[in-house]
Swiss-Prot record:
UniProt binding sites for ATP: 71-78
BP GO annotations: mRNA processing; RNA splicing
Listed name of the protein: Probable pre-mRNA-splicing factor ATP-dependent RNA helicase DEAH9
One function term, GO molecular function aspect: ATP hydrolysis activity
Segments forming domain Helicase C-terminal: 261-438
Family to which the UniProt record says this protein belongs: Belongs to the DEAD box helicase family. DEAH subfamily. DDX35 sub-subfamily.
Gene3D superfamilies found in the cross-reference section: 1.20.120.1080, P-loop containing nucleotide triphosphate hydrolases
Lineage, highest ranks first: Eukaryota, Viridiplantae, Streptophyta, Embryophyta, Tracheophyta
Enzyme Commission no: 3.6.4.13
Catalytic activity annotation: ATP + H2O = ADP + phosphate + H(+)
Keywords: ATP-binding, Helicase, Hydrolase, mRNA processing, mRNA splicing, Nucleotide-binding, Spliceosome
CC annotations in GO: cytosol; plasmodesma; spliceosomal complex
Length: 695
């Protein structure tokens, strides 16, 4: 594998970054790595590129209902703008400044940094809220960080978000479903609350497109004699300057194995380049663990090229202590190699990174409304993501980005922007969120990127089958309203409601809590046999959901839970989180009038409750096949994932929670069922398919 080298004929150098080669700041002498880490916090803040725009930002927010800020990676917009707003008085009189992020890890990291800069305890003046975790103090917290989804749920209690004076939607370019819903809802709220200020912030978003979206609002007519409100036309501000130049290297030929290419590039950097940490973008936990294992093998066989390397994973399922390793200073004589998902593209500032390796791929959700399968697939990234990734280098000195794809591919084949999640996802949760907020005409909702009518119709059909919507596509009472109240996937919520009638709500709420964390299992390198043996200690013949009950029971009964988790390859932090989530769900269930009862070991009741929620995900084993299943809807070919306790068991009928696509479509979290339950729990859904099934 060869790269174009700086100073040779290729790659091209372009000031505007279209080829992604060099990014220059306005004043390269404004920051130095030697003084940056030792300066006090106030001087650090003043050195950030966004600081010289402080007055302009506050003027625009004062005079415009919506301000769109395009700030390059590392400009400081995420941490500084909320502080500027507070300093300017936008949090006086009990008002709150909100800043949303698409990811939970970013919410936690950014809020901690802002609290540190303001010299306050996290959870008091500065706080954060993510699903199942609220670190705010009512009447005290004035700067609040939260996910887009949490802010949407707050609208169920306060439709006009009256406590907020300014809402900043950060990293809007990610275009998650929650971000797009939030943008549409905030546009509606502004018509009723002209005093509400919105800031749309991103590193790459097309500002004019977003401006046109907010500029298309229906004109408000102020009462005669009233004080004129802010201008409706959005203001656009570009915050330039990131610190240091970044040179881009492309491979000369396409690579056949991007994980091995990543490892060889890490070793190349370690052998030839001056000190500086490396940030690697891979697709997910499995890729990251594989790359780390290859690096460790290289360390044993070739110590010269790999000496001093300190590989660290970064993905959303890590414990807090593992996350903190990412942000700690690199030990003397070491080079941190942070192997990350696209979580490191936005918001998280990783000081010390000088080199970036971009695999060119990420995991993305894609939904097929015909087969009704939503898959997590490895897909090429967009130019916008590529620029975000390269922008992570060059924060402490001139940096380099190694792209594991050709320059021709970047310039002529890579798409400019990614497809918004709204246009490639299952919309069941989206529909119920909007219905719960009183929006009946969903097809007429003002979307930044309209979803497909096929996906919307399919979502309405599933919700009708779940008895969440009635014949008029309105929330049913009480089922629909109860499901909307639970902060869970609607299928998991329906599973909980069914458990109340089946007398197994304690068990199903436990399962729901486990499904709400990334994973309770730890994927350790080089000990696959020991891991498999540990999982077998809890394995239940009925499937993964019942296995989760065994894991939870063992955790509660363990006298030394930390050591017990270590011995059984379980994530202690995840298990603690399961206990917390379970307690919260029990409180919500009581408030909703759901009867809490244990089935005392009746696993048929548990499996039936799971089926009541996930009946649309039923599959049947193909006769005389080697583990091939066919979905009842769409007749898609699927397989049980190797991580399931039912792998190689191949029961005749199952339901699954989700599908992950690699070379095959694999079912995750699988449980055995009796096929007769399908028409019992979902007669509307299966009445037209009954003849096609051999019950």
């Amino acid at each position: 594998m060869a790269f174009w080298k700086p100073g040779t004929e290729k790659p091209r150098f372009e000031e505007d970054g279209e080829g992604g080669i060099v990014f220059m700041s306005n004043n390269l002498a404004s920051s130095s790595s030697s003084s940056y880490g030792y300066a006090n916090i106030e001087k650090q803040r003043q050195r950030l590129p966004v600081y010289k725009y402080r007055t302009e930002i506050l003027y625009l927010v004062e005079n415009h209902a919506t301000t769109i800020i395009v700030g390059e990676t590392g400009s400081g917009k995420t941490t500084q703008i909320p502080q500027y707003l507070k300093e300017a008085g936008w949090a006086e009189g009990g008002r709150v400044i909100a800043c949303t992020q698409p990811r939970r890890l970013a919410v936690q990291a950014v809020s901690a940094r802002v609290a540190e800069e303001m010299g306050v305890n996290l959870g008091e003046e500065v706080g954060y809220t993510i699903r199942f975790e609220d670190h705010t103090t009512s009447g005290v917290t004035s700067v609040k960080f939260l996910t887009d989804g949490v802010l949407i749920r707050e609208m169920m209690e306060d439709p006009l978000l009256t406590k907020y004076s300014v809402i900043m939607i950060d990293e809007a370019h990610e275009r998650s479903i929650s971000t797009d819903i939030l943008l549409g809802l905030l546009k509606k709220i502004q018509r009723r609350r002209p005093e509400l200020r919105l800031i749309i912030s991103s590193a790459t978003i097309e500002a004019k497109t977003m401006s046109n979206f907010f500029n298309s609002s229906k004109k408000r007519h102020a009462p005669e004699g009233s004080t004129p409100g802010p201008k409706l036309e959005p203001a656009i501000l570009s915050v330039e300057g990131r610190g240091f130049s970044v040179k881009i290297h492309y491979v000369e030929e396409p690579v056949s194995d991007y994980i091995r290419s990543v490892v060889s590039t890490i070793l190349l950097i370690n052998e030839r380049e001056p000190p500086g940490d490396v940030l690697v973008f891979l697709t997910g936990q499995e890729d990251i663990e594989t790359a780390i294992k290859l690096l460790e093998e290289e360390a044993h066989s070739n110590q010269k090229n790999s000496s001093g390397l300190l590989p660290l994973p970064l993905y959303s399922g890590l414990s807090r202590s593992e996350q903190e390793l990412i942000f700690t200073p690199t030990p003397r004589g070491k080079r941190k190699v942070i192997l990350s998902t696209n979580i490191a593209e936005t918001s998280l500032t990783l000081e010390g990174v000088v080199y970036v390796i971009d695999s060119g791929f990420s995991k993305q959700k894609f939904y097929n409304p015909i087969s009704d399968i939503e898959s997590l697939v490895v897909a090429p990234i967009s130019k916008a993501s590529a620029r975000q990734r390269s922008g992570r280098a060059g924060r402490v000195r001139p940096g380099k980005c190694y792209r594991l794809y050709t320059e021709d591919y970047f310039l002529n084949q890579m798409p400019g922007e990614g497809i918004p999640e709204m246009q490639r996802s299952n919309l069941v949760s989206t529909v119920i969120q909007l219905k719960a907020l009183g929006i009946d005409n969903i097809l007429g909702f003002d979307w930044p990127a309209p979803p497909s009518s096929e996906a919307m119709i399919r979502a309405l059909e599933v919700l009708y089958s779940l008895q969440i919507l009635d014949d008029d596509a309105k929330l049913t009472s009480p089922t629909g309203f109860q499901v909307a109240e639970l902060p869970l996937d609607p299928m998991i919520s329906k599973m909980i409601l069914a458990s109340s009638e089946l007398g197994c709500s304690h068990e199903i709420i436990t399962i729901a809590a486990v499904l709400s964390v990334q994973s309770v299992w730890i994927i350790a390198r080089g000990v696959q046999k020991e891991q498999d043996e540990a999982k077998l200690r809890f394995a239940a013949a009925e499937g993964d959901h019942v296995t989760f009950l065994n894991v939870y029971k063992g955790f509660l009964e363990s006298k030394k839970p930390t050591q017990w988790c270590y011995k059984n390859f379980l994530n202690y932090q995840s298990m603690k989180k399961v206990v917390e989530i379970r307690d919260q769900l029990k409180r919500i269930a009581r408030r909703l009038g759901i009867t809490l009862k244990s089935c005392d070991g009746d696993m048929e009741a548990v499996r039936k409750a799971v089926t009541a929620g996930f009946f649309a995900n039923a599959c049947r084993l193909e006769p005389h096949s080697n583990g091939v299943y066919k979905t009842i809807r769409g007749s898609e070919e699927v397989y049980i994932h190797p991580s399931s306790v039912l792998f190689r068991v191949n029961p005749k009928w199952v339901v699954y929670q989700s599908i992950v696509s690699t070379e095959r479509q694999y079912m995750r979290n699988v449980v055995t069922i009796n096929p007769s339950w399908l028409t019992e729990v979902a007669p509307h859904f299966y009445q037209n398919r009954q003849n096609a099934m051999s019950f």
